[in-house]
Each structure stands twice: as structure tokens, then as C-alpha cells.
Amino acid sequence: VYDTYCFTEEKRHMGMFNGMLLGNCTEIMQLSEVSDINAYYEEDTIRRGISCNLGSLNIATVMENKRIKEATKAAIDSLTMVSDLTNIDVVPTIKKANEELHSVGLGAMNLHGFLAKNFIMYESKEALDFCNVFFMMVNFYSLERSMEIAKERGETFKDFEKSEYANGNYFNKYVTKEYIPQTEKVKSLFEGIYIPTKEDWANLKEQVMKHGVYNAYRMAIAPNQSTSYIMNSTASVMPVVDTIEVREYGDSTTFYPMPYLTNDNYFFYKSAYDMDQ
């Protein structure tokens, strides 16, 4: 990464740099409304903007400590506090959105690092098996905690009653299918960790329909490239670019070897450029 530039391309909101087509931030698929900002003597119509209240779980850390439930619920509490305290009068669109939607985005980092550490290829069926179970659990516990907050405060996000949570449709696939490990390798990774069942989802469905949900948005996978280095992690849930990444900031160059890199797992850090996509 070199110098940073900001520009606006009206048609596609994308631009070409050094032969690469680049776009704006895309981890947030969230309601955004255009406000009507008028002259000083006219009244403005303020609608909802987007505030990225983001955080990421370190997959390796929560898996090795067998604390997916605890980490997820603590993260939702922390992110919810950020949303609640982000009361910016000078940016009324953000204030309105936070007050009405309480949106947060809990994501994850270090997927490739965790897989490589456990000798699992990123493209393998074991990797897909792991992701199906892990992110189902993050979804379950983040939703459960959001329901608990709504119950504790007696408050849901605005228009909850119009949502798929309220009519129960959101839960259809979870109450009809068990999301459990299918491969022996992944079964061993989740050994000693309780995995929510169809019955747990059915119970959560009842609780959500009764008490509501506090956060209109709960999960979002952020790119967290720089923050992943601080956490000794691979970035986000994406495959690595190289076993030793090189980043340039102005006049400084940083070399970052992938976490847990050894002679034994070297070939499990397959570059994204070499993968069949």
C-alpha cells in the first residue's frame, strides 16, 4: 500500500489504478437514506446514515480457548456500547441511525492463519466445513445476545415488527438443518465446544419473536489488513497474498511473515493468486 487517495466516480463508484479496478468499502450492506439539506432559512429532512461500528474475533484465539460463546457475546456488548455512545450532534444522520437501528458489525480475522496452523488447505472441504460451523455459532450467539439486550432494556431496533426476525422466517434454515462438523478433522477442532442444535435455534426463535432484537445489523466481515498485523493474524477471512507480505507506507517498508509460519505448514499458506477461484 502506497499513498492514499480519495476520489468520487459518479457512475460506478469505482476507479482504475495501475490496471486494477478498485471500489469503495463493501463490507457494510446496510440501509442508507439520502437526507435533504437545504439553505439556512429552510428546514432540513434528516434521514439515516451509516456508522461502521466494527470489531473482529481472532478465530485462532477463540477456538483454542474454546470460548466462542463468551467472546461473541462480549463483542456484541462492546460494539453496542460504541453505537449507544456515538451521539454526534454535528452529524445528525449518524445520530439518527444509531438511535433507531443500533447497528454493529462483528466479523472475524485469522481464518487462513488458523487453517494453516492446523494443516488445512484454504480451498479444502475441511475449510468450508469449519466455516459453516464457526460462523453459524457466531451468528447464533450474537443474535442471542442482541435478544437479551432487547429484553433487558425493553427496546428493539426501529420497525423490528416488520422484520424477518419478527415473523420467524429468518430461522427457517436453522430449525430444519443441523450445522455440525462433517469431516473428522473439523470434528476434532470443535472437540469440547458446545455447538447449538436445531432445538437451540427453535428456542431462540421463540425468544426473539417474544422479546425482539436490539441490533438491526449484527455481523460484518471487515478487511482489517493493518489491525490483523497487530493481532498476529491473517487479514479478515481472505487468503493470504504471500507468505511474507510487503507493505509500504510513504517512505517506510514493512515485511510481515504470516503467523505461525514454519517449514511444516509453509505450503498451507497458498497465495490467493494461485487459487482456483
Predicted regions and their residues:
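Internal intein/HINT superfamily modules and their associated LAGLIDADG
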Residues: 1-24, 226
